[in-house]
Amino acid sequence: MKTLTFISLMTTSVACLGSCTNPAASDAQQPWIVDRFDDIKVIRYEVPGFERLPLEQKELIYYLAEAAKCGRDILFDQNCAANLPIRRTLETLYLNYKGDRTSDEWKALEKYLKKVWFANGIHHHYSNDKFRPEFSESFFREAAASVGMDRFPADFDFLCKVIFDPAIYPTRLNQAAGADMLWTSASNYYSNVRQHEAEQFYAAMAAADAGDPCPVSYGLNSQLVKEEKTGRLYERTWKVGGMYSPAIERIVYWLEKARDVAAEPQKQTLAALIDYYRTGDLKQFDRYNILWLQDTVSNVDFVNGFIETYGDPLGYKASWEANVNFVDSAACRRTRIISENAQWFEDHSPVDPAYKKKVVKGVSAKVITVAMLGGDCYPATPIGINLPNADWIRKEHGSKSVTIDNITYAYDRAAHGNGFEEEFMLRPEDRERIDKYGKIGDDLHTDLHECLGHGSGQLAPGVKGDELKSYGSTLEETRADLFGLYYLGDPKLVELGLVPSFDVAKAQYASYILNGMMTQLARIEPGKNVEESHMRNRKLIAE
């Protein structure tokens, strides 16, 4: 699971690592917000501490970072089958158009391309609605003709229909009650499959393994396809030699280089991930996850694979993502205290004892500096991560939580002095409290959300965790947020030295309610539903 903030983020390459020792030193020299379009703010982030790492760790980060960049096209295709040809068509136009680049139509096309880049496709990354082009179809066709139609796909006419006809692929993820969520969603996790067919397919898999105490995450790394003529259902597995093989082969190439320079136990973890990518075997994925979460000593760490299921309305299929990071040792004090006291928090949570863990195992948490992001972590970036997602692994082996400090710092700097608080917070004492404690409140809530929220509790016997379908992700994020919000106001945090007073909780409560009830809705067109799981979660709690 991951935590997303209410400010979208596009990451940029770090041009000068030498200036990254102290982020505050560069605040006055360069803007944190480098571009704006529609509801998007493009924010620069820095990677402090990279230059102080040993050479072998820098080399490891480089190889892992290259692997993180190789899965971009996977995510585009997962989000919608038309995404890649549309993106490539737009990029060809952008690079080769010789006409007037100052015209309103061209500027509208440029903005549309930026939105496609940012959202990894033609649908908004939060609302899931298809983008409406502000340039005309006639201009688009004339621009393409001026470049030369031989440069564009043979199905150019169909791509025009996808871009300009609002009835084609109208939403990436439809979770409306009563709708066939697969048939009406543009995402590419299922091909020619109805919702009831997919549910029956995976229910049969689960029933066949009903006695397995360590069930795999059925369907996690595959597209489910229905043959037109025979009606047969089968999976196209995402692996070397399977679907997305060219991209996965490049990922494996760089992971093998990383494995060769990594030290144990990380060398073994990388080997397990490579085996999984080669075989597509979900048992191998579980083995990799256990090795990964048990490694609490490596300074450099990573996430790479098909991880989160937010994009699948049924909660089976995972989008591809990557994250390369290293430990921010100075900021790890609070996460160390939280993880060391995980049993106390579990025991004192306001939850039915039947759903509490008797013994909390393997809870680890740290603050990290992210060095590279890819796939579904880019460019709208999480600020916290808690993995793995498999319930039986979390129960038997624990979980690993991280808070991404250089990203939260960039958010804070970009928001500082923008006039928002003065406009929407009427009481001076609220503004003063949030200015003083807002950053620590945000960071601590993320720590509590990831380490204790997602890491807490256990399912009832016989419950697999996918029964809630489209509601599952939202309610899990709600559970984790409520856990964090509840403990922010507990005197235990003062006792542990994590907060100076209850004012930290007051600051977080005020900003959370404001965000859930109003701020985040700036992304949603009037009359549209809130679809993204984290946004739904905040709205549910705040209202």
Q: What residue ranges belong to the model's regions?
A:
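N-terminal-proximal low-complexity accessory segments that begin disordered
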Residues: 27-89
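C-terminal motif of bacterial Sec signal peptides marking the signal peptidase cleavage site
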Residues: 15-19
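Short alpha-helix carrying the canonical HExxH Zn2+-binding catalytic motif
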Residues: 439-452
